[in-house]
């Protein structure tokens, strides 16, 4: 059995337009349109952060990654509390990073502080109502299948693709 993996598809990331639909910055002026209204259709995770916050710098890339992997089942909105102090006060943000999930126009879940990817993924899976798989896991499964079929060339190509990510 031969598995052909399009290298461009395997390394694909959302385009700027797709990414903009999944991940955006918000402000006090646009919060209702960016968070409340979309949360009527799909869960919206709001990441309250600040540029000086060390834990924010490790959490935000993880949240962005899991948001992309969720494939539109959850959206992410980021709010810089230094630029949106009024909004942070209204939502009683005491420390950063603080993450709230909105569904149906209301906050339904959240956490404070940096979290490992496994916890962020579990948080998203609760919101999405099911597993959010890393694309790497699917590629590794394909590679294992290729090895089981003695297709070493395909397996090698798949493993190299994973390492290059």
Question: What does each of the following model-derived ranges do?
Answer:
Residues 92:
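Flexible N-lobe loop architecture of eukaryotic-like protein kinase catalytic domains
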């Amino acid at each position: 059995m031969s598995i052909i993996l399009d290298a461009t598809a395997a390394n694909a990331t959302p385009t700027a337009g797709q990414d903009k639909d999944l991940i955006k910055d918000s402000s006090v002026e646009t919060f209702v349109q960016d968070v409340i209204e979309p949360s009527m259709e799909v869960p919206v995770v709001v990441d309250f952060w600040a540029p000086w916050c060390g834990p924010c710098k490790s959490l935000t890339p993880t949240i962005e990654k899991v948001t992309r992997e969720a494939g539109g089942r959850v959206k992410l909105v980021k709010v810089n509390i230094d630029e949106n102090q009024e909004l942070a006060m209204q939502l009683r943000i005491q420390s950063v990073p603080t993450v709230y999930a909105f569904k149906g126009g209301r906050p339904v879940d959240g956490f404070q502080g940096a979290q490992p990817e496994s916890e962020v993924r579990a948080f998203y899976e609760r919101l999405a109502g099911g597993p959010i798989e890393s694309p790497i896991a699917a590629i590794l499964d394909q590679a294992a299948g290729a090895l089981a079929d003695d297709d070493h060339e395909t397996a090698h190509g798949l493993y190299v693709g994973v390492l290059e990510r």
